[in-house]
Amino acid sequence: MPTWMLLFCLLCVTSSNLSSALEDNCKTFSTTLPNMLRELRAAFSSVKTYFQTRDKLETKLIDKSLLEELKSYLGCQALSEMIKFYLEEVMPRAEENELDVKEDVGSLGEKLKALRLRLKRCHRFLPCEDNSRVVKQVRNTYKELQEQGVYKAMGDFDIFIGYMEEYLTMHIGK
């Protein structure tokens, strides 16, 4: 048998196994989600005090309007945009400017990336396209806070985890 045919057969077998593994992964998501959120909270606890003690502003970055939007038809997009906001804006800035906690913030980011990847693979959790006005407001406030924005955003990360948990728990039963 030619080598290319053997490789093609191997690819077909591997891709079907991968596809069924991904489906199984989504079937068990409701049982693994609490552990993923617990790991996210544990990773955040290692930097929580650092950022919250440096947050001297009374400005609210994350409030109940985000939770309400997560519960609305835009929930999927709001969650997707908030994860992107933390991964692409907040955490890189926190790692760059706060060398004392760089490694811990990096670890927190990796856990959030793993959760995002899992959510994207299981389409029923993130099947969305519309833009979120609340997340836009969060981003605008973050930018207005300039240097203090990173402390505010990282200090509020636990609120975001709680809201994310509510959104995901609401969708597991569907």
From Swiss-Prot:
It is found in: Secreted. It comes from the Eukaryota. GO terms for biological process: immune response; regulation of cytokine production. Disulfide bonds join C26-C122, C76-C128. Glycans are attached at N17. Residues 1-16 form the signal peptide. One of its GO terms (molecular function) is cytokine activity. Keywords: Cytokine, Disulfide bond, Glycoprotein, Secreted, Signal. GO terms for cellular component: extracellular space. InterPro entries: 4_helix_cytokine-like_core (IPR009079), IL-10 (IPR000098), IL-10/19/20/24/26 (IPR020443), IL-10_CS (IPR020423). The keyword Disulfide bond applies. The keyword Glycoprotein applies. Gene3D superfamilies: 1.20.1250.10. Homodimer. Interacts with IL10RA and IL10RB. This is Interleukin-10. It comes from Trichosurus vulpecula. The gene is IL10.
